[in-house]
Structure formats: structure tokens, C-alpha cells
Amino acid sequence: MSMFGIGKNNQTINPQNIAMAEQEVEMMSDIFNRLVMTCHKKCISPKYYEADLTKGESVCIDRCVSKYFEANQSLSQHMQKRGQENPTP
């Protein structure tokens, strides 16, 4: 068995699966970039006094990331529930 299907000549690649995987990677990249921008803006001063994060900045970033993922998960569950209640034709 080869990694990523390399060397498998008998199996075709489904373009729809590739498109879905690319869309998922793009979505995760967007979430990560928004998370970094949001938490950096909230927790880190624009004037850097030290090369490393201070304890306060580190704690703030940790809490910010945690809250961001909690909110994202809650919103996803809410949207999924609404989608099940009101299916589109």
C-alpha cells in the first residue's frame, strides 16, 4: 500500500473528492488565519518589548483560542440543527 495513492495505477482519482478536499483545506486555512488575526489583535500589544510572549499574553492567547473554538463549535451545531429542521428542497 502506498501513501497518497502514489504507485496505484488501477485506481482513478475522483475529481469531486479532490475538489471537496481542496475546499476543506481552504476553509480550515481561513479559520486559522482569522483566529490568528483576532487573538493577536486582542492579546498582543503592537509595541513589542520582549522577544517572547509575556505570561499575560500567553494566557490571553490560550483563552482566546479556546473561546474561538467553543463559539465555532456552538455555531456549527446550531446551523446543523437548523438545517435538519428546515431541509432545503
UniProtKB/Swiss-Prot annotation:
Domain of life: Eukaryota
Motif (Twin CX3C motif): 39-64
Zinc is among the record's keywords: yes
Protein localization: Mitochondrion inner membrane
InterPro entries reported in the protein's UniProt record: Tim10-like, Tim10-like_dom_sf
Coiled-coil zones: none
GO biological process, one term: protein insertion into mitochondrial inner membrane
Gene Ontology CC terms: mitochondrial inner membrane; mitochondrial intermembrane space protein transporter complex
Disulfide bonds: 39-64, 43-60
Gene Ontology molecular function: metal ion binding
Key words, A-Z: Chaperone, Disulfide bond, Membrane, Metal-binding, Mitochondrion, Mitochondrion inner membrane, Protein transport, Translocation, Transport, Zinc
Membrane topology value: Peripheral membrane protein
Chain's role: Mitochondrial intermembrane chaperone that participates in the import and insertion of multi-pass transmembrane proteins into the mitochondrial inner membrane. Also required for the transfer of beta-barrel precursors from the TOM complex to the sorting and assembly machinery (SAM complex) of the outer membrane. Acts as a chaperone-like protein that protects the hydrophobic precursors from aggregation and guide them through the mitochondrial intermembrane space.
Subunit structure, interactors included: Heterohexamer; composed of 3 copies of TIM9 and 3 copies of TIM10, named soluble 70 kDa complex. Associates directly with the TIM22 complex, whose core is composed of TIM22 and TIM54. Interacts with the transmembrane regions of multi-pass transmembrane proteins in transit.
Entry note about domains: The twin CX3C motif contains 4 conserved Cys residues that form 2 disulfide bonds in the mitochondrial intermembrane space. However, during the transit of TIM10 from cytoplasm into mitochondrion, the Cys residues probably coordinate zinc, thereby preventing folding and allowing its transfer across mitochondrial outer membrane.
Family (UniProt): Belongs to the small Tim family.
PANTHER family: MITOCHONDRIAL IMPORT INNER MEMBRANE TRANSLOCASE SUBUNIT TIM10 (PTHR11038:SF16)
Protein name: Mitochondrial import inner membrane translocase subunit tim10
Organism of this sequence: Schizosaccharomyces pombe (strain 972 / ATCC 24843) (Fission yeast)
Lineage, highest ranks first: Eukaryota, Fungi, Dikarya, Ascomycota, Taphrinomycotina
Gene name, Swiss-Prot/TrEMBL: tim10
